Structures are given as C-alpha cells and as structure tokens.
Amino acid sequence: MSLLFSRCNSIVTVKKDKRHMAEVNASPLKHFVTAKKKINGIFEQLGAYIQESASFLEDTHRNTELDPVTTEEQVLDVKGYLSKVRGISEVLARRHMKVAFFGRTSNGKSTVINAMLWDKVLPSGIGHTTNCFLRVGGTDGHEAFLLTEGSEEKKSVKTVNQLAHALHQDEQLHAGSMVSVMWPNSKCPLLKDDLVLMDSPGIDVTTELDSWIDKFCLDADVFVLVANSESTLMQTEKQFFHKVSERLSRPNIFILNNRWDASASEPEYMEEVRRQHMERCTSFLVDELGVVDRAQAGDRIFFVSAKEVLSARVQKAQGMPEGGGALAEGFQVRMFEFQNFERQFEECISQSAVKTKFEQHTVRAKQIAEAVRLIMDSLHIAAQEQRVYCLEMREERQDRLRFIDKQLELLAQDYKLRIKQITEEVERQVSTAMAEEIRRLSVLVDEYQMDFHPSPVVLKVYKNELHRHIEEGLGRNLSDRCSTAIASSLQTMQQDMIDGLKPLLPVSMRNQIDMLVPRQCFSLSYDLNCDKLCADFQEDIEFHFSLGWTMLVNRFLGPKNSRRALLGYSDQVQRPLPLTPANPSMPPLPQSSLTQEELMVSMVTGLASLTSRTSMGILVVGGVVWKAVGWRLIALSFGLYGLLYVYERLTWTTKAKERAFKRQFVEYASEKLQLIISYTGSNCSHQVQQELSGTFAHLCQQVDITRDNLEQEIAAMNKKVEALDSLQSRAKLLRNKAGWLDSELNMFTHQYLQPSR
C-alpha cells in the first residue's frame, strides 16, 4: 500500500514538474517572473533578518548590566544595511523586463509592438507617427489609462483613437517626453509577465540621442532595431546603437527587417536581397558593435511583416481565420519568422533581465548577509569570552565566601575561648586587688581629714564625705593596680581580633578598618557605691569605761551576745532542732551537748539576772570578798579602778571620738566590702567581656557586609551568565540565519544567474 502511495506521489510530482516545464517552455518570460518572486522573497526575509539583528544589537548595546559586547559602530552599520535592503527591495519591486524599440520614422515600430501584444494598443499606420516615448505596461485594472511625465493624474483611454487624440492634443509633449500607457493585463497576456515595451520617436528626427540613452535606455534589457527591408541600414541608425554600445556593455540587440512582405512582389530577387540584408546586419552586429559572434548573429536578425502579423492576430482574437483577408504570398513563412523572433526575444530578455536586474543586488545581498554574520559571530565570541570570565569570577567569589564562612567560624570559637580566659583573669585580678585594698582600708580612712563633731548634722556631712573619699580612694587604688594591665590585655586582644579578621575583608577596607571599628579608650568602672553600702552604719561615740560591766561582757561575748546577755534574753536562746524525730525510748541528750558559747551566755545571763533582782546580792558578794582579802586590798583596788575611770573619762576628747568613729567605720565597711568582692570582680569582667564582644561583633558586622556584597556579586554574576547565555543563543541563531540566507542566495545564483551548461 505504501509502495502504491509512493508511486502515486511520484507520478503526481512528475506531472507537476512536467507542467512547470511546459509553462516555462511555453513562456520563457516566466523565468524572470519566478526569479523576481524568488529574489523579492529572499530580500523580504533579509530585511526582516536585518531588522531583527538591528533591534537585537541595539538592545544589547543599551544593556548596562553587561560589559560591552558590541559597538555603536556595529549598530549603525546594521541600521545602514537595513535602509539599503529596504531601498533595494523597493527597486526590485519595481523591476521589470524592458525592451526598447528604435528605428527611423514610419519603419513600423508601433506596429511591431501591437503585433506582439495581439492588439492595436498604440496608434499606428498612415497618419500616426509617434512623437514621444511611449512606455506600455500592464495593469491589474480593467480600464486603460495613461500617465504623463511629471503627473500622477490617470487619464482614461478606452480606444486607440482616444489614445492617439490624447497624445496629439497634449502640447507639452516633445520627443524627449515619456508617456506611460497602462493596458489591462486581461487584454494582453504578454504584459502579465512584468514586460514593458517602449516605443520611441524616429531616431532620424532628433539630435538628442545622448540624452535619450541616458534617460530611457540604460535600464533596457533588449533593444530592437526596426529597419525597413526596402532599404539598407542608415548611418543614423548605426550611430545611435554605437552610442548605446559605448554606454552599455554588450547590449542585447535584435534587428527586425520589417515590411518583408514587399519582397513577395519580386520573388526572383528575394533570396539575394535577404542575403545582402543578412550580411550587412551581421557585419553591423559582429564587426562594428561586437555584441555577438557570427554563430549567434543568425538568431538576432529576422525578416518579418508586422502589419500582416497584427492583422492575422486581431482576426484570430475576433474568432476569424488567421489567414483570412488579402495576404501576400509567403505569409506563413513570415509569420513563423515573427514567432521565432518572439521566442528568441523572450529567451534572451528573460535571461538578460534576470542577470542585469538581479545579479548586482544578489551580490550586494550576499555581502550584507556576510557582514551581519561576521558582526553576530564577533558578538557571539565576545559574549562567550565574557561568560567564561563571569564564571571564573563567580567561582572565585564562591571560594572566597566559603573561606570567609569557615575562617569566621574558627575565629569565633577561638576568640570566645580567649575572651572567657581574659574575663576570668580580670575577675581574679580585681577580686585579689580589692581584698588587699580592704585590708588596707584603715590607712585610707586615716588619710581622711575633716573637722569632726559629734553633733548629728556634722556627723551626717562627715559620713557623706568619708563615703566619697573611700569611693574615690578605692577606685583610684584599684585602677592603679588593675586598669593598666587589663586595658593592655584588652587592647592586645582587640588588635589580635583585627589582625585575624582583616584578611576576611576586601583590600579596600583593610586600610580603613581602624576608622570602621570604634577604638574608644576603655576604662573600668568599679562602681562600689559606698554611700549606699554603708548607709545603715550606726556609730557609737558615747564614753564607755574599759573595765565597765558592759565593756567586759562585750569583750568576752562580742557585741551581739553581750546585748542579749545584758538585756536578759536568756529564754530566747534557740536550741538546735534535732535532725530526726524525737524517740521517747531514747534517753534525753546530756547537758554537755550544749556548745561552749551557749553555756557561757547562759551562765553570765543567770549571773546578771541574779544581780539585777536585788541589791542584796552586791552586799553578799562584797561581804564574802571582804572576809577573804581584807579591806585594804579592796580599797586599793577601788582606788586604782577609780583613777583609771577618771583617766579614761578625761582623755575621751573629740579626737578620741573621731578615732573611735573611724575604727568602727573601718570594721563595718570592711565587713560590707567583703560581701561585694565577688560582685565587683564579676562586674569588671563583664565590662571587659562586653568591650571585647562588641569589638568582635563590629568586626563581624564588617565581615557580614563583605559576605553580603559577595552574595550580591554572585547573584549578579548568575544573572549576568544567564543573560550572556541568552545573548549567545540569540547571536548564534542570527549568525546561522545569515548562513541560511547566504545559501538561499547561492541557490538563487545557481538557479537563475549562472548560465546553464
């Protein structure tokens, strides 16, 4: 089944090819039509391609995110190519095959044109002489019209007589004027194939041959010299074509010996006359003009009767016999000669027109396509090089980012451990120094000098100033002992941090790191708050005899227990509770289990209680002592006791009170300051930790800025690589498209411009 289908397709294809070949064989002018259609299509594609390339290059040149991969000169060049291609496309759209008919007046130029068109399009015959250039072209409309030179007005023409009348009525027309006669294609099939026929005034009536050639002949593909077979070639005719040959390289020239039907009246001289005309025309074409060789000359010289052909074709068009009417003998031979002329003319003009009209533009199109291809290739290479550079830069930044992250993690662990060691050392130094300063507190208090008075107002001021003195003195001494070493250690640590993190920063920031990281002079704040710490200090500067009962009890028991003993609070002495529940079966604890301190307090308390109950106790005791030692010893003892009391009472001055006050304050303040040694050491270590942590955090902030910049650069590189990938792909596509257009132009050249072997 598939084989049958393939054979059917082959048969259809063969039939189509045969039909196409038949059309080409039937009308060689189709060669130009198909070539024109092909080249117009190629130029349309070329224009679209250059438009796309120009837009692409302009967008690429304006893209500020990419480094320059194209130049403004390249953009302008491609835009220039676009305008050139558009201009060529407009020229190609107007291109057509052009044949120019020249000859002396009344040689039958218009009749030849009418015969070729199978209709009486141009005025001809007796009384009708062409007085200007007539350009006959086809129009898709159904009405004929004419256009005069310099005017866009379409003048309607329905018949040949109207055309003749219009041409003769226009007084502005002269021999060098051009009138375009647009005839419906439906009436003249020859005009459908982009063929333009140009009739001219007789070349024997003007001397403006040079201007005619420049104005009307330079774009002609074929020249037809319509000669009168009843006479030989005139010098005027030869002179004109000599000028044409000087302006154009090897012009295509046909010679029609018209009115050959007159030879039928003298048949005995026909061949001799034909031979003479052939020799002279061949000599003119070959020897004088050099446009053909002798082998080709026979295909350029014809003997016809245009009037007979026109009459026969008009009759045939009207449905009458072709040979009807009064026709001279040999009509069929002359008809065949005219048809042979038409065949040779069509083949010549189609080949010549394709070559002259399209070859130069084809070469120019190839040059433009190649130029744009080279631009796209250079852009592709530049984008590829930039992409490789971006990939290398991205890899470098990614490696840098990984190095920063790893190094920052290691440094953070190391600095965290070192900060911990430094803070512990600071706490130890401050605690040791403060303990030593507390032991020397009495010296600091003794250095305090201010007028002392026991009045409450003066004492309040005295204590406030003493607090300030202690605060400043302790702070100064601690600063002298600790601050310098701690500050030096802190600065060393900060410099180590800077040196460790500096390699993680970009080179531009390394020299500015000292300005970026604040380096304030660090000062420890000990913050002892002596005024609040000693706010509840209660001095005792009343006179107390050293051998008095209260002082003795205080000396043995201490201030706290003596107060309890003297006030009779023995019942409030707390026994320690047993750690286990009491067991009735167990014997009570022995009395000796009481502590020695509790026993002493109990005894003295009992004694004091006894003496306080009755004065008789004193008498009893005194009597007992009296009996034991005698009155003299007692009297002496009381005398010495009294003298000692008087001495101490007299020496209890303001200075003594101040010394007692300072001694009491030293004891009290020392006890209080001992409580905050650990707190002060921790506070100082916390300050150092905050300072070092702040420095490290600020350095890390700069590193984070560097990391963010690297991440942004990596993201920008990724975006740039994507843009370059797209750019490369587009440039490669456009480069390949230029190659495809070049292959299309090569195919066109091979098919239409190169001579067939």
Swiss-Prot record:
Membrane topology label: Multi-pass membrane protein
Modified residues (Phosphothreonine): T111
Reactions catalysed according to its record: GTP + H2O = GDP + phosphate + H(+)
Phosphoserine: modified positions: S442
EC numbers, comma separated: 3.6.5.-
GO terms for cellular component: cytosol; microtubule cytoskeleton; mitochondrial outer membrane; mitochondrion
Annotated region described as G2 motif, given as residue ranges: 129-130
InterPro entries in the cross-refs: Dynamin_N, Fzo/mitofusin_HR2, G_DYNAMIN_dom, Mitofusin_fam, P-loop_NTPase
Annotated binding of GTP, by residue: S106, N107, G108, K109, S110, T111, N258, R259, W260, D261, S305, K307
S-S pairs: none
Keyword Coiled coil: yes
Known role: Mitochondrial outer membrane GTPase that mediates mitochondrial clustering and fusion. Mitochondria are highly dynamic organelles, and their morphology is determined by the equilibrium between mitochondrial fusion and fission events. Overexpression induces the formation of mitochondrial networks. Membrane clustering requires GTPase activity and may involve a major rearrangement of the coiled coil domains. Plays a central role in mitochondrial metabolism and may be associated with obesity and/or apoptosis processes.
Similarity annotation: Belongs to the TRAFAC class dynamin-like GTPase superfamily. Dynamin/Fzo/YdjA family. Mitofusin subfamily.
Name under which the protein is recorded: Mitofusin-2
